Structures are given as structure tokens and as C-alpha cells.
Amino acid sequence: MGKRISFLLLLFALFHVLILPVMGENSVTHLFPAYRYEGIVTKDSEGVSVGDVVKMIESESGKSHLVMKSNGKRIRLPWDAVTPIQKESPSLPAVTAEDVVAFVYKMGYTSKTDYMLFTDLSRFRTYLLEYGDEGWEMTRSLPCAVGDPYHPTPSGRFEIDYKCSCIGKTDQYLCRHAMCFYGSYMYHSVLLDWKGEAVLDGRLSSAISHGCIRLSPEDSAALYAIIPTGTAVYIR
């Protein structure tokens, strides 16, 4: 009887030491699935055939798409050679600040500064993390708008290269608090009129931009005020 109890206690201990941590890690990873912009090839070109499904990485509006083939090779295709696949927003469970932090540690995310930005394309959320005495802590969860199917928001690891108080198109629109992380891709406010006073398009929590990540005027201002250049950006 004593040996049986000892054996059961050993199994119980092994379950908690070996099995539960793995289950926990997997569940955290599954909470944040990688979003994938995809398109269907409509013209034979550079080793791809009509009907092939490719991953869309970035686009130059009206000119070309940078895509990834099934073998991992990246190629640039003419604008009209790919038709983006329209996707429904995935139904995902709500996540807590603890979930976000656990995922960041699980993935090994790091930053050169005491700040980190993590944008969850599936949930249309941008999380601000700050590093303190106890490690990373999520301090803000912000609704955002991301790239539409024709203009994907690039995924991966980036850094804030530079900041600009405003950008825009003369006499058409203006965006405030721009923070560039990759080429012409940046975080910035929603679209304002040319004077920067009235909101022209304040939509958030949707895929409607040309690849940049839009935030409310208040949230973009808050990030702009504290995020230094060199801060890591993770987009998934």
C-alpha cells in the first residue's frame, strides 16, 4: 500500500513538473495565433502559377506585392498578378495582461529599451509593455486599425527607427505622432483633416489602412511621448 501511494505521489509530482508547464506554454501560444495575409496568383510569373496561394508580406499600392511562395522564397509580383483573400476576423478569446506577458517571455521577445510594442493583428490590439523591477509588465492595451487585404501590415520583429510629429498628404489628410518601424510603415493617429483638427476617418479595430497601424489621437500621443527610438516592435 505504501509503495502504491509513493508511486502515485511520484506520478503527481512528474505531472506538475513536466506536463503542466508544457500545457501552459502551449495554451499561451495558442492564444496568439500568427495572422497571415494571403493572396491567389492570377497571372503566371517568376515560378508561380495561376491559382497558387502565396503569403502577402507588403505592398506598394497600385504597383506591386512582395509575396512569399510555399518554399519560403520571396518574390515581387505586379499589382494585378495577385488577388488578396478576404478573411473573416478570427473569433478569439479575450486575453489578460498576464497572458500577454507570458507570451512575450515564451517567445523570447526582447527590447533595447525599457519599452516594447506588440501588435496582435488578429485582435486589432497594440500592447505596450514596460520593463521594471519585476520584468516586463503590460501597461496599455490599445485598439488599432491595421492593413487591409490589399495592403498587409508586415509581421515580424522591427524597431522604432525615427519619430515625426505629423505626416500627411497636402490639403487632403494629416496623421499625428508617427513612429516609423519599417520603411514607410509606422504607428500613427487616425486620419485627420489637413489642419489636424477634425477626424476624417476614426475607425479602429478593423483592417482598413494601407499597412500602417492607426491609433486614436489620444493613444498615439501617449505612445509618442514615451517611446524612444530603438524600441522593439513585434507584429504577429
Give a label for each model feature:
Residues 2-23:
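Sec-dependent N-terminal signal peptides of Gram-positive bacterial secreted proteins and lipoproteins
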Residues 26-58:
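Beta-loop motif signature
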Residues 36, 62, 112-114, 121-124, ...:
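Extracytoplasmic
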Residues 43-47, 149, 223-226:
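Short, surface-exposed secondary-structure edge patches
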Residues 45-80:
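SH3/SH3-like beta-barrel superfamily modules
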Residues 152-155, 164-236:
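Exported/periplasmic cell-wall-interacting domains
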